[in-house]
Amino acid sequence: MIPHIYDYVIIGGGIGGACTGAYLSNKGKSVCLLEKEPYLGGCSSTFERKGYRYNLGATTFAGWGKGMIVREFFQSLGVEPKLLPLKSAFVQIKDSINLPHHEDLDTFLQALESNFPHPKNRSFWEEVYKLNHEFYRHNSYIYTKRTLAQFIRSIATFLPIAKLFWPLVLQRGDRYIRTHLPNISPTYYQALQAQLRIVTQTSIKESSALGLVLALGYPFLGNAYAKGGMGALFDALEHKIDTVCKGTLVLHIDRRSDYYIAHTHQGDFLGHNLILNLPLFESGRLFDKGPIRDYFNKFKALDNDQSAFMLYGILKCKKPLEHHYQILLPKPLKNTISDAIFVSFSDANDEKMAPSGHLSMTLSVHTKSSAWMGLEKNAYRTQKAHLVSQLLEIVCDTLGVQKEDFVTYFGATPKTFKRYIGRSQLGGIPMSFTRPFFRNPANDTPFRGLYCVGDTTFAAQGWPGVIAGVRNLSRILDANN
C-alpha cells in the first residue's frame, strides 16, 4: 500500500504552527498538523482544571488595529474571531501610580501627565506612535538564510525600512531615553522598562532604540480580549486546517530524498515538506546524528534560561477590574528576575471562562528555568508555595481584593511548562542591541523542504511577531514553488 504523503507536515500547534497550517490549507495544500497536547495554542492556549478555565499565558491579543498584521492575516483566511476591543491594553500600578495604556494617544498622554509629568512627554510619545505605525506599513521584505547569496539578496529587501529606522537600530535604548526623555524619575524609568521587557525580554540598557520604540508602541496598535479565552482563537484557526492530529507526540524524524517521516506513537506521517513550530535549540534531538541535528544544535546558545512563574486562580468578585494589569514592585521577589508582574482577568461577562460573578486570573513573572529544574522535591514544593503566597498577597493588596474571595488558586513553574508543553524556556529570543534581527534564525534552513516558525525564529514573539514570521515563510515558499 502506497502511504499518503502530505504537501506539508507541521509539528507543533502554537501560534506559528496553527497560523501556518491555516494559511497553507487556505492555499489548497494538503496539510497535517501534529500537536502533542489535546488542544492547540502552546503557551498561548487555554486549559481546563477542575472545571475552571485559564489562559496559559498572561498575554494580550495585540496587532488588531485597522491595517495591522494580525487583523489582515485573520481576514485573509476569512476567520472572524469573537473579540472585545480594548481601549486600554493594560494598566500599570505602583503606590499612587495608576497608568492605563490607552490606544488613543491623547487620552494616554492625559493619563501619563497625571502620573509622570515631563516637558517632553508629548514629543516622545508622538514619535513612538508615529514610528510604530510607519514600521508596520513596510511589509514587502523577505528574509532567508538558505544560502549566503539568498541571505544577501533578502537583506536588500529591508532597505526601505533601513532608510527610515537604521539610526534606531544603531542606538541603544538607554541613550534614546536620555536624549528624548532626560532626567525622568526612577519609577517612570521602571514603568518603561517593565513594558519593554514583556515584549523584547530585555532591559533598556540591552535593547536597541528600535526595539524600545516598538515595545512601547504596541498599545497603540489595537488590542483585544478573546471571548472564551485565547484558546478560542485556535479553535477558529483549527477549522481552517486540512488535518489536525492532537494528542500526537512526535518521537523521531527521518529524512528521505523527497519527503520527511514524522514517527509518532499514533503512527507515521509523511510530508514532502516539514515545518517545525518548536524551540529551535531543542529540535535537533528529533533527528539522527548528522547535518540536520548539528544545524539545530548550534542554536543551543539561544536558550537563555528565561522562563515564567505563573499563578492561576478563580476570583469571586463584583468589583470592576481591568483585563490586564502590570504591577510594579520595589524589587524582584526571590527566585524571580523582574520587578514587575503581569496579571490578566477574564471579562466579567465571559461565562465560558468563569461562572457568573467570577473571574479567571492568569499572572506571570519572569524567572530562570535553572531556579526550578534541579530542585529536590520538598525544596521545590516549599519554594513554589512561598512564591505563590507572595504573589497572591501582592494581587490582593494592590487590587483591593480578598484572599478569601479566591475559590481556587495554584502555581506553575518552568518545570510545569516542560511537562505539559515540552519547553521550559519562554518568551522567544531576546531582541537586544547586540542581536539585531538578521542574526536570528530564518524561517528556512539549508535543507530542502525543512522550515521553522515560532518565537525562536524570525521575526519575534507574540501574535504580531510570529505572524510576521508566518508571512515571511509564505513568501519563501512562494519563491521556491
Residue ranges, per PLM feature:
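Mid-domain catalytic core of redox enzymes
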Residues: F220, L249-S356
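N-terminal glycine-rich phosphate/pyrophosphate-binding loop and immediately adjacent elements
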Residues: I2-S140
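Active-site/ligand-binding neighborhood in enzyme catalytic cores
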Residues: H133-T243, G247, R423-F433
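A glycine-rich dinucleotide-binding beta-alpha-beta segment and adjacent secondary-structure elements
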Residues: T187-V199, V401-A460
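C-terminal segments that line or cap access tunnels to active or ligand-binding sites in enzymes
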Residues: K316-K415
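A conserved FAD-binding loop/helix module that cradles the flavin
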Residues: A58, D455-D478
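General small-molecule cofactor/ligand-binding pocket signal
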Residues: K82-L84, V244-G247, V407, Y451
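Short coil-to-beta-strand
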Residues: K205-L210, S356-V365, P446-R448
